[in-house]
Amino acid sequence: MQYFFYLCTRKRKILVFMKHIHLFLGILLALLPCQIFASIDMQAHVASDEGKQSYTTYLNKQKSYYTGVYAYDQLLAITGDELFGRLNQLMGNTCKLDAWNLDYGDLRYAYVDVDRDLNRSGYIIGYYDGKQLDGDWGSGWNREHTWPQSKGAKKEITMGHDMQSVRPTNTSVNSSRGNDAYGETGSYYDPNEISISNSAYKKINLGTYRGDAARVILYDYLVYGQAGSYKNSLYNGNAQLLSKLGTSGVFESIHVLLKWHMQDPPSLTEMVRNDGAQDYQGNRNPIIDYPELAIEIFSDYSKITCYPVTYNVAETVSPRYMHTLSDGFVTYLTNRDGSHPSQVSVTGGQYTYDASLGRLIITKVTGNLTISTSTPTIDVAVDVCAQARIYNVAGELVATTMDVHATLPQLRSGLYIISQGTQSRKVFVP
C-alpha cells in the first residue's frame, strides 16, 4: 500500500500590475490589449485550515523559486543562523516591492486578485474571519498590518506595504485587534477566537488563523530581521526584537508562534495565496512552502525529547518522531474508502479528535505515543522538529520508516513527501 499526493491542475496567467488603474480602467480597457490586464488565476480560495490534503500546481512555481544554493536539499543541510541568513538573502534578492515601485496604495487594488474568492466574482476573503468582502476598495474592509504600524511596520517603509504581511480585513475585525500583540493569555489578541463567518465554507474554528498569523510574523522576521540575532532577540530578549516581545510588542513569545505554526499547519488557502503574492511582488513566504524551516531556525533543540509513535496501519510502522514535552501536533486520518475513523484512542498524550474532519490534535506528549483507530487508516505521520509528513491523499506508499520503497518514475505527477526519521524530503515528479 502506498500514499501519494496529486496535483489539481490549473492555468496560470501573468499579472501585469498597473498603478492606479482604477482611475482610468474604462478608457484603458478600450484602448489597450486585454492581455495587459490579465489577473492571477488562482485555485479555489478556501477559508478553512484543514492541512495540506490537496495541492494545486503552485508546486511548479515553488520548485522554480528554490534553486541553486536556495534549493531545498541545500537548505536542509544548514540550520540556525546560517539558514536564517540564507533565506534572508533569498528574500532580498527576489522581493521587488521597491524595484517595481509598489507602495501602500497599490495594495487596495491588488487584493482582488491575490485574495479573491472564486466562489463569488469580484469578492475577496477577509483575514481573521474568512468573510466574503466586496473586492472594491471602500466596501467595508481595510488593510491590516499584522505587524502593527505603531510597532515598526510604518506604511511608508517596505515592511509596511508587503503583500505577504498586510492583509485585507473586515474593518470591524481589524479594529477589534487594534495593535494588540498576538498571544493566548491576558490582553493578547488570539486569532483562534475568530469564527469563520463565510457560510459558503465549512465552519472550522480550532486554530483557524493562529498558524497563519504565526507564519506571517516569522516571515517578517526572516525578511526584515537581522541575521545572527534571532536567539538573543527571541529567547533572551536583549537584541533585535527586544521591544517586540510581550503585550507591548507584537507577539507573546517565539514558543507561542512555533506552537501555533505546528498545531495549525499551512492550509491550501495560504499555499495558493503565496503564489499570488509572488506574482505581485516577486518573493514567497518560505515558512508556508517548507514549514519545517521555521523549526530548524527558531526552535530551541535543548527542549526536545524523542518519543516513538506507533500507528495501527496495515503494515507496522514505528518511526521515531521528535516531540516537545509541552506541545503536540496536528494530523489527519482517512480510511481507505475516503471516510474518517469514527473513533480514535491515544496513549502517551492528551488529544482531541474531530471525526467529521479526521483531524487529530495531540495537545501534549507525555510518553511513547500509540494512536489507534476504529478501522485501519491511511495515516499521517508528523515530525514536530522537522514537520516531516506523509499526507493522507489516496495512493501508494512512498516510504516506510527509513526505507524508500517506491520508484519515482512509476508514480503519478505530483508532490511526494519522503519521511526519513527526523528528516523529510519533498520530491516533485513532473
Residue ranges of each PLM-predicted region?
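C-terminal tail/sorting-segment detector
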Residues: 20, 376-378, 415-430
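Bacterial N-terminal signal peptides
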Residues: 25-35
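N-terminal module-boundary/linker segments of secreted carbohydrate-active enzymes
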Residues: 37-130, 296-307
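Domain-level detector of nuclease and nuclease-like folds
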Residues: 132, 136-310
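Secondary-structure capping and domain/repeat boundary segments
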Residues: 309-374
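A glycine-anchored, Pro-Gly-centered beta-turn/N-cap motif
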Residues: 349, 412-415
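Glycine-centered coil/turn sites that cap beta-strands in beta-rich domains
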Residues: 368-389, 403-410
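Short, glycine-anchored, charge-dense loop/turn motifs used at functional sites
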Residues: 390-397, 416
